[in-house]
Regions:
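N-terminal small-domain helix-loop-helix segment of the aminotransferase-like
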Residues: 2-91, 98, 280, 382-384
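Conserved core segment of the aminotransferase class I/II
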Residues: 45, 219, 223-294, 302, ...
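Conserved core of the PLP fold type I
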Residues: 56-185, 202-203, 209-220, 373
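Short Gly/Ser/Thr- and Asp/Glu-enriched loop/turn motifs at secondary-structure junctions
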Residues: 82-83, 315-321, 352-354
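Helix C-cap/helix->beta junction micro-motif
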Residues: 127, 189-190, 221, 341, ...
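PLP-dependent enzyme catalytic core of the Aspartate aminotransferase-like
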Residues: 153, 336-346, 350-384
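Conserved glycine-rich beta-strand-loop-beta hairpin in the small C-terminal domain of fold type I
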Residues: 276, 292-301, 313-325
Length: 384
């Protein structure tokens, strides 16, 4: 490999959410969704060049990052977007919250499929909208999928938005065209705006799976979709706070931009430098990352099968976040239990997945092996 994914600098003391949570405690953090890899050297070089300029004034959206995004969408996903459809944002979480304000009124409802990334569940409440949760179901291949029949049973006249996570966090599914078409048809039948969070779209390690930008499924769904993306998960850049939305519909775009005014800050100059370098020069690094993550996923899958049959781990195709069903362990508080045994995992309860934990395998393999052994020791310690 050209790039090294087997080491990572010490992150303690740098304000790292992931690592400083357990500062001073003997707990290995394998929780929140950022990776323990240095970013692509090409991105670091671009940031250094911007730093060397020495002037860090107010920055407005400009041509270079917009061109990088448009070319990336075309090259990577066959999605022909226009610069006028883009809105640069400091993150996708504020964007989801903004959508609840922009496209619904107080008292109306927002639907999503669970378990899911917690901000999907909190955003409607923050906006004083009602949340409708529809559980994912299992298909014949024992993969998680969207339950359209359950969605039909739950939708109401006051439902205005469906929020989709594609690829899905935390279950790691890459929805195929048939599944996305079913969601699109559902939204059209009930006149719903589709908010499609596709931040994990470039982290597909299954070579048989392919990401489909939801708004490309049909012209009709494109006219009612807000697509949300960012390079932050793929290139390990969440601290740069640079994301974007793509909204084709003129009226929806105007409502979104009107809601932003005075609330959302502009993207900073380093965010623009990072997104431009990632999409223009980061592809070789990304391909090697996927190869490494594929190896890590295989390690997790094999370890659970052979060493921890008490944990249910279903097949996944994307992300670096493994979703474990630990119901059979009989733990009152699984996250707390594993922390007591030296490993920090993400609690599934805020995802609407009690008795589940999420493990981040975006880390050097030796660290992952250590974490899996700690989990195994914790499971065995139940009987001591």
């Amino acid at each position: 490999m050209k790039y090294n994914f087997d080491t990572c600098p010490n992150r303690i003391g740098y304000g790292s959410l992931k690592w400083d949570k357990y500062k001073g405690r003997d707990i290995l953090p394998l929780w929140v969704a950022d990776m323990d890899f240095t970013s692509a050297p090409e991105i670091i070089e671009a940031l250094q060049q911007r730093l060397d300029h020495g002037v860090f004034g107010y920055t407005i959206p400009f041509e270079e990052p917009a061109e990088a995004v448009i070319n990336y969408l075309d090259r990577q996903h066959g999605y022909f977007a226009k610069a006028g459809w883009l809105n640069f944002l400091p993150g996708l979480v504020p964007a989801i919250n903004l959508c609840c304000h922009a496209f619904t009124e107080p008292g109306e409802s927002v639907m999503t499929a669970t378990p899911v990334y917690p901000p999907f569940l909190s955003a409607p409440d923050y906006a004083h909208r009602e949340l409708i949760k529809v559980p994912l179901s299992l298909n014949e291949a024992d993969q998680w999928t969207l339950d359209i029949d359950a969605m039909e049973a739950a939708v109401r006249p006051d439902t205005k938005i469906f929020v989709l996570c594609s690829p899905h966090n935390p279950v790691g599914r890459v929805f195929n065209k048939e599944e996305l078409t079913a969601v699109a048809d559902f939204c059209e039948r009930h006149d719903l705006i589709l908010i499609s969070d596709e931040i994990h779209c470039d982290l597909i390690f299954d070579e048989d799976a392919k990401h489909i930008v939801t708004s490309t499924v049909s012209k009709q769904i494109a006219d009612r979709t807000v697509t949300l993306m960012a390079p932050s998960k793929t290139y390990n850049l969440p601290g740069l706070a640079c994301a974007f939305s793509v909204i084709e519909n003129t009226k929806l775009r105007a409502r979104f931009r009107e809601t932003i005014r005075g609330i959302i800050t502009e993207v900073n100059c380093f965010g623009y430098a990072g997104i431009t370098a990632a999409y223009n020069h980061g592809e070789t690094w990304r391909q090697e990352l996927l190869t490494y993550l594929r190896g890590n996923y295989n390690l997790v899958e094999n370890f659970i099968k052979t060493e921890l049959p008490e944990i249910t781990f279903r097949p996944m195709e994307a992300t670096y976040l493994a979703w474990f069903d630990v119901n059979k362990l009989g733990l009152k508080d699984p996250t707390e239990y594993f922390e007591k045994h030296g490993v920090g995992l993400t609690d599934g309860t805020p995802f609407d997945g009690p008795q589940h934990v999420r493990l981040n395998f975006g880390c050097p393999r030796a660290r992952l092996e250590e974490g899996l052994e700690l989990i195994a020791k914790a499971v065995r310690a139940r009987d001591e």
